[in-house]
A protein has these predicted regions:
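Solvent-exposed loop/turn and edge beta-strand elements of beta-rich ligand-binding domains
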Residues: 1-166
Length: 166
């Protein structure tokens, strides 16, 4: 079914992202970053399509304070450990944090992807962010839905410290 294609695509996308990204800690500072989402899928003809009008929410769950990641007040009682930084653990943590955010009705910023399937969350302070798709999006006869995921600003990508993460 089409949902299977969506799940397979998102797993491959997330795994490739997490394989190249590991957690780093930077000194507390005023440097800002961004997270760009490029949302694509495969239609019923197995052709790559840009997924426009997909709504993504972003929550800052931790911030950098004196070279230490500190829980934001609205997430500090979640009792979810972020110590394990493996891809599998991060996937589980993101799902748990998103469920917690929904249960506690935590406010977030929301953006939609454009016709190229892109959106960018800018001016982000150092910390860990939870990103989740709100609902699903259709393209042709296929329906697409992304699993929640975590991104750290800055991130270590292929040996380089990156403040602007795609």
């Amino acid at each position: 079914m089409k949902v299977r294609n969506i799940i397979v695509f998102m797993i491959v996308f997330l795994m490739s992202t997490f394989m190249n990204v590991s957690t780093i800690h930077a000194e507390s500072g005023s440097r800002k970053g961004s997270i760009q989402i490029v949302y694509k899928g495969r239609n019923e003809l197995n052709q790559e399509v840009n997924l426009s009008d997909a709504k993504f929410s972003i929550y800052q769950v931790q911030y950098m304070s004196t070279d230490t990641l500190t829980w934001k007040d609205n997430f500090k009682d979640s009792h979810i450990s972020l110590e394990d930084t493996s891809a599998e653990a991060r996937e589980k943590q993101a799902k748990q944090l998103y469920k917690y955010a929904q249960q506690k009705d935590i406010s977030c910023s929301l953006q939609e992807t454009n016709t190229l399937g892109r959106t960018t969350f800018s001016n982000l302070t150092q910390g860990i962010y939870l990103i989740a798709q709100e609902g699903s999006v259709e393209s042709g006869k296929s329906q697409f839905e992304s699993a929640p995921f975590l991104v750290e600003i800055p991130s270590l990508v292929d040996g380089s410290v990156e403040y602007n993460v795609t």
